[in-house]
Structure formats: C-alpha cells, structure tokens
C-alpha cells in the first residue's frame, strides 16, 4: 500500500490540476491543509492506537484510504467536483500519518529484537526499489485512457495492501 501513498504524494496535485482544473494556488493551499490534517490524524490516532491496537488502526486507515481514493476518482462526475476532492484530500491527509506511523510501529512489534536494524534497512530498501511502480502504473493508464483511470492504480495498491495485511492478521 505504500506505493499507493507514494503515487498520491507525487501525482495527486497533477490529477487535481489536470482533471479538476485546480489552480496552483489551490494546490498550494490543499497541500498545507493536508499536512495539518496529517499531523492532527497522527496525534489523534496515537491515542486511538493505545485503545484499539496498531493492527486495527492500520486496517481502518487502509479502508479510509480506499474511500478517499474512490471519492477522488468519482469527484469529476459529481455536482461539486472540487468540494468532493477536498473531502477526499482531508480524509487522505488525516489517514496518512496514522498509516505510516502505525505501519512502522507494527513492524517494530513483529520483528525479532536482535534483527531490527536489518529488517528496517530491508524495509527502506524495498520501499525505494519499488517506489516507481505506482507512478509508472498511473502514467501508463493515464496515457492509455485518462487521469481518472490512472488514479485507479492507486486504488489497486490500497486494496491489495488491505487484502495482504488482513491475510497476515489471520495467521
């Protein structure tokens, strides 16, 4: 699911400009607001994680990232596309911080104590090694069809991540 986040970070603004007609000023304001909501989400979900556990927060954040991406996808077909995209963005921003922090926290919980450096190093390496996949898929689908169809690649990464994460929880 991290490739989906990387793609959103890299291409979300381009989607907003190209598909929804956002101005550069609107993108700048959106970026600032998203960062504020990411900080708030991290803070609030830090307390929630203490109550319900890291796995549930990750699961919830992934479901909300799917909802957010779906809203961004359908926004051009609504009566208020920019408003729907803003809602999508605020939801995404709120969930990004908890998703990333809880994912690292969960990893720290499940790996052997004496192997933490190796596992986190491998985690960083694989994240960098595959970080091109989301933007590549987005670009390929955009070239063939449209930016909206390109955005579906992000949805695919989030859904696959959600499925894999829940398969891991079953074991």
Predicted regions and their residues:
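Short amphipathic helix-loop junctions that connect adjacent transmembrane helices
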Residues: 10-27
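Loop-to-transmembrane helix entry/capping segments in MFS-fold secondary transporters
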Residues: 24-25, 113-123
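Hydrophobic core of transmembrane alpha-helices in multi-pass small-molecule transporters
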Residues: 82-98
């Amino acid at each position: 699911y991290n490739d989906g986040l990387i793609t959103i970070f890299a291409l979300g603004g381009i989607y907003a400009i190209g598909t929804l007609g956002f101005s550069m000023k609107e993108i700048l304001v959106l970026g600032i607001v998203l960062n504020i909501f990411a900080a708030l989400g991290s803070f609030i979900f830090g307390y929630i994680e203490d109550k319900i556990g890291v796995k549930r927060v990750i699961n919830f954040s992934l479901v909300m990232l799917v909802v957010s991406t779906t809203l961004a996808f359908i926004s051009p077909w609504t009566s208020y596309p920019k408003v729907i995209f803003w809602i999508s963005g605020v939801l995404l921003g709120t969930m990004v911080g908890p998703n990333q922090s809880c994912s690292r926290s969960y990893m720290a919980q499940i790996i052997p104590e004496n192997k933490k450096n190796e596992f986190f190093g491998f985690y960083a390496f694989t994240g960098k090694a595959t970080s091109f996949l989301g933007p590549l898929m987005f670009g390929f689908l955009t070239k063939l069809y449209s930016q909206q169809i390109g955005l579906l690649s992000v949805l695919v990464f989030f859904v696959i991540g959600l499925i894999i994460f829940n398969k891991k929880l079953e074991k």
